[in-house]
């Protein structure tokens, strides 16, 4: 880019920061917090760009860069995430870590950065965790059982706009795992209920609704996620503002399955 | 010697080719499908839909992606919508019109028969997605809603708020998850394909690296599908996700698959401008904003006043001025080029590389609430990134690399020049010519995966006598050795420059010389500097860590190494294509008014490059494009 050679970092202010970061070589070794100093962090940078900068610095110093997951960097793929000063995805409301910007911090701040912590999310390295358990929950029933082809015309079944909107509200979950990380019980209720609610709000999802709820809840329990005791931390940290009322709906679907 | 490329387009009238081809295709009976194994690399829209469909049909499928879940593929980021010729609006849409718009939008550089098939199956896609529970936007009567997109005069775009790609991918992902649960698909996440294995001239497997443990592994099959997305990240800064790469298709190219039209790149006009040297990606602001936003810059050079202090008379609404008929809604390539032009004249705003997208007039006309209803999520995203309020001050935007029309060459069956290797989605070159219309990539990915490949792969497997091959075959050992050698080489150089630094440097060359305006001099300079940078890379790269562990530096280094070869082919293709068409603008080839000037006599063809053993020394083969159903005209939007 032409401006890349020009004034670096636009109109941002520069920060000097102390970072306390969880370092863990792999799932078998024990981890620990390490401290790093970093200067010249523009307030225009995203949080992950700050970590990129730190990594370039660490490599130059002959140290191992910090591993962290990310891909889209625009808040939609659900790949990124870490506990920042104790908050899942950092200080900003309804914002993923990749969309968090350094202007939310001040010069001289100390920032602690740790991975999601939950039995069902073992650490792979540093800030990267294994979320295969989320895959298993979806595989256990998070779908409508249709094959490819032979489906009716898309407008054959009208769906009230309100129902479609409710389904869409729940379907926005990005599967990041922040809800689990923030929950004192490491419960996956918010994530699971979002999928159940998305499908239960649509006529196409009706046929399997009770079986789906039963299967997904069973998978969730077997995978080592905890129970919901109504702390509400999940809703508070969710970057997509998924609501706890989905959990209530899931419980109704589940009891329907038991009847 | 140039190879003759056979597109295998079936004979007969355009509208009957696909039906006829399906009827004539060989079938594999359901009981026998279990005996065939298929590898699907990539599980974005194209790959997830293909893997789910093939698994559902009964084939033994192994699927791969480098993220920790198929749900995270780059397709998830698509915002605006998906086209389909449903004609639910009764506004004159039809399969033929969608076909025509796509061919014209692509500046007459795509294959007619493929595009027509795309338009035909587009209607089935929407049915399929609704059955899976994709929550498309609806009207109060409960029927599906539509919006309009650039390059079309009808309203045929289906959408799910500003997250259409997410919802479509989650639909395909749910179908794939079901097939995984039924044991029809074996899913390998956090696994990267590093090479292709060809046995007796046919694609029979891949070599992968497990990104968690570093283990290099062999996988054999009867057919291989590459659904690995586009290569926009050769420019370093783009709207693509960080992991998007050319590795899978490039390695296949080096094993014999022809690479088609590498220089065709789409540069999207409305993205948030670059803010500094440490920026890692650019963010798209949907095309739909141009419905209500007016694009302008100050009339005077170097005018540093705030937007609100510049009086009407001193503003230049350059798109409205130059293209009165289409105004702010000219196609993407034209909007991008004009923004660059005014910035090059010194009239850019902000840091100099930006123009205003101003909603003041629309807000005054329809009210802030209506604008919030239409674009709320985009305005929020803009505010999050820039800390400015676009309801009060105009947005600043600048073009950015967004999509790549080029890709591996495929015939009508989506089969590459290596038998048994099929290529789907953005990874192939097939349907968009030199410029893609908005909302057509999602359509193509799902068309390929749900409705085209399942037939054409059946035809291949049913009609070919394949010897049994296992991963113990010597060919697998040889390719595995190549992969290990390469990985070890990257780690052993221990130079001074990081993979990120090399990637940025390559990106600058690509953007400056192969970006929105390309010249002979610039391209020649790129052709000199890219090999030099590659040479430096292989002597001075610093990759920390080890092969047998989770190593993100090693991942990036491998991808940058391939971009450094690919970039050269890109520049070469752009240099040889002595015309301007769609997203490819050669400054030497423009009309008196500065518009793109095609040369149909000499360039109405696909350029398909063949690896000959050395980077930059590829042979250029040609597939002549035959237009029997549309008339080639110069695009005009005045
Ligand atoms: C910001 C943005 C907005 C867009 N909006 C729209 C829109 O509104 N409408 C529209 O039609 N199009 C849009 N597009 C374009 C469209 O999203 C993409 O072209 C399309 O989704 C590509 O799908 P795909 O399945 O081909 O590839 P991708 O979704 O990119 O998937 C690639 C897959 O391949 C895997 N992969 C890649 N390399 C390897 C490897 N070496 N080994 C193993 N796995 C590998 C990845 O893990 C991933 O699973 C947009 C694009 C962007 C960037
Ligand atoms: S419910 Fe929210 S926090 Fe939990 S996985 Fe989904 S998006 Fe993330
Ligand atoms: S990197 Fe995709 S959501 Fe953050």
Task: Specify the residue positions occupied by each region the protein language model found.
Chain A
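Charged, low-complexity intrinsically disordered regulatory segments in eukaryotic signaling
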Residues: 1-20
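Glycine-rich phosphate/adenylate-binding loop and adjacent beta-alpha elements
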Residues: 84-108, 113
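Eukaryote-biased recognition of intrinsically disordered, low-complexity regulatory segments
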Residues: 14-36
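Short, structured protein-protein interaction patches enriched in aromatics and acidic/basic residues
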Residues: 67-79
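Short strand-turn-strand beta-turns centered on an Asx-Gly dipeptide
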Residues: 22, 38-39, 84-86
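Short, contiguous acidic and Ser/Thr-rich linear segments
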Residues: 34-46
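Ferredoxin-type iron-sulfur electron-transfer modules in oxidoreductases and energy-metabolism complexes
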Residues: 45-64, 109-259
């Amino acid at each position: 880019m032409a401006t890349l050679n020009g004034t670096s970092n636009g109109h941002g202010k520069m920060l000097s920061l102390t970072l306390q970061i969880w370092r863990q070589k792999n799932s078998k070794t024990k981890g620990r917090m390490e401290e790093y100093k970093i200067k010249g962090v523009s307030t225009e940078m995203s949080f992950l760009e700050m970590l990129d900068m730190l990594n370039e610095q660490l490599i130059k110093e002959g140290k191992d860069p910090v591993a962290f997951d990310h891909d889209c960097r625009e808040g939609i793929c659900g790949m990124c995430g870490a506990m920042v000063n104790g908050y899942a995805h950092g200080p900003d409301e309804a914002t993923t870590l990749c969309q968090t910007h350094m202007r939310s911090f001040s010069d001289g701040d100390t920032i602690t950065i740790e991975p999601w912590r939950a039995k069902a999310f073992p650490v792979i390295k540093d800030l990267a965790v294994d979320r295969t358990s989320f895959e298993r929950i979806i595989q256990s029933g998070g779908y409508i059982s249709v094959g490819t082809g032979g489906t009716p015309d898309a407008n054959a079944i009208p769906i009230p706009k309100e129902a479609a909107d409710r389904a869409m509200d729940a379907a926005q979950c990005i599967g990041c795992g922040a809800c689990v990380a923030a929950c004192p019980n490491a419960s996956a209720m918010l994530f699971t209920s979002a999928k159940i609610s998305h499908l239960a709000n649509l006529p196409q999802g009706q046929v399997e609704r009770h079986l789906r709820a039963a299967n997904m809840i069973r998978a969730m329990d077997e995978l080592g996620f905890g129970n919901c005791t109504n702390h509400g931390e999940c809703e508070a940290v969710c970057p997509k503002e998924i609501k706890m009322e989905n959990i209530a709906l899931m419980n109704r679907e589940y009891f329907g399955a038991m009847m | 010697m140039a190879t003759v490329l056979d597109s295998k387009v079936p004979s007969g009238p355009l509208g009957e080719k696909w039906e006829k081809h399906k009827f004539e295709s060989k079938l594999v009976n359901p009981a026998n499908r279990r005996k065939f194994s298929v590898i699907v690399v990539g599980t974005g829209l194209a790959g997830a839909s293909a893997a789910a469909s093939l698994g559902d049909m009964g084939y033994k499928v192994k699927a791969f992606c480098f993220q920790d879940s198929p749900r995270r593929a780059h397709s998830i980021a698509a915002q605006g919508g998906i086209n389909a010729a449903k004609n639910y609006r009764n506004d004159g849409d039809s399969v033929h019109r969608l076909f025509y718009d796509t061919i014209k939008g692509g500046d007459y550089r795509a294959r007619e028969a493929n595009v027509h098939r795309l338009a035909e199956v587009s209607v089935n896609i929407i049915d399929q997605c609704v059955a899976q529970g994709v929550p498309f936007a609806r009207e109060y009567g409960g029927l599906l809603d539509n919006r309009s997109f650039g390059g079309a005069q009808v309203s045929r775009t289906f959408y799910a708020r500003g997250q259409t790609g997410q919802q479509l991918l989650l639909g395909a992902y749910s179908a794939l998850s079901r097939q995984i649960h039924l044991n029809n698909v074996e899913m390998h996440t956090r696994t990267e394909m590093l090479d292709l294995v060809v046995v007796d001239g046919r694609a029979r497997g891949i070599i992968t690296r497990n990104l968690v443990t570093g283990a290099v592994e062999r996988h054999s099959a009867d057919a291989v599908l590459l659904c690995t997305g586009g290569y926009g990240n050769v420019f370093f800064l783009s709207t693509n996700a960080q992991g998007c790469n050319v590795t899978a298709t490039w390695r296949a190219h080096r094993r014999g698959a022809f690479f088609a039209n590498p220089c065709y790149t789409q540069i999207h006009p409305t993205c948030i401008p670059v803010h500094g040297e440490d920026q890692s990606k650019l963010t798209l602001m949907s095309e739909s904003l141009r419905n209500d936003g007016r694009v302008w810059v100050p009339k005077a050079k170097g005018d540093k006043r705030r937007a609100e202090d510049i009086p009407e008379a001193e503003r230049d609404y350059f798109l409205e001025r130059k293209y009165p008929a289409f105004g702010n809604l000219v196609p993407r390539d034209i909007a991008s080029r004009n923004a660059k032009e005014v910035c090059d004249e010194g009239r850019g705003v902000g840091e100099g590389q930006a123009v205003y997208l101003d909603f003041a007039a629309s807000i005054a006309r329809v009210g802030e609430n209506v604008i919030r209803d239409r674009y709320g999520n985009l305005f929020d995203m803009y505010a999050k990134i820039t800390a400015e309020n676009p309801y009060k001050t105009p947005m600043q935007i600048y073009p950015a690399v967004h999509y790549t029309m080029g890709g591996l060459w495929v015939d009508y069956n989506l089969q590459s020049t290596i038998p048994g290797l099929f290529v789907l989605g953005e990874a192939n070159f097939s349907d968009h010519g030199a410029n893609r219309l908005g909302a057509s990539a999602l359509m193509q990915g799902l068309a390929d995966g749900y409705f085209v490949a399942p037939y054409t792969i059946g035809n291949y497997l049913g009609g070919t006598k394949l010897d049994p091959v296992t991963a113990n075959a010597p060919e697998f050992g040889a390719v595995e050795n190549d992969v290990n050698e390469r990985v070890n080489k990257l780690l052993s150089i221990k130079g001074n420059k990081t993979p990120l630094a090399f990637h940025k440097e390559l990106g600058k060359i690509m953007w400056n010389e192969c970006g929105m305006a390309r010249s002979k001099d610039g391209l020649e300079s790129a052709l000199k500097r890219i090999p030099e940078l590659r040479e430096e890379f292989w002597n001075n790269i610093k990759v920390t860590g080890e092969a047998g562990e989770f190593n993100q530096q090693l991942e990036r280094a491998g991808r940058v190494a391939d971009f450094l070869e690919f970039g050269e082919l890109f520049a070469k293709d752009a240099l040889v294509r002595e015309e301007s068409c769609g997203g490819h603008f050669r400054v030497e080839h423009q009309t008196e008014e500065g518009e793109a000037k095609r040369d149909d006599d000499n360039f109405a063809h696909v350029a398909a490059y063949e690896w000959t053993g050395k980077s930059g020394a590829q042979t250029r083969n040609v597939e002549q494009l035959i237009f029997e159903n549309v008339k080639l005209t110069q695009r005009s939007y005045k």
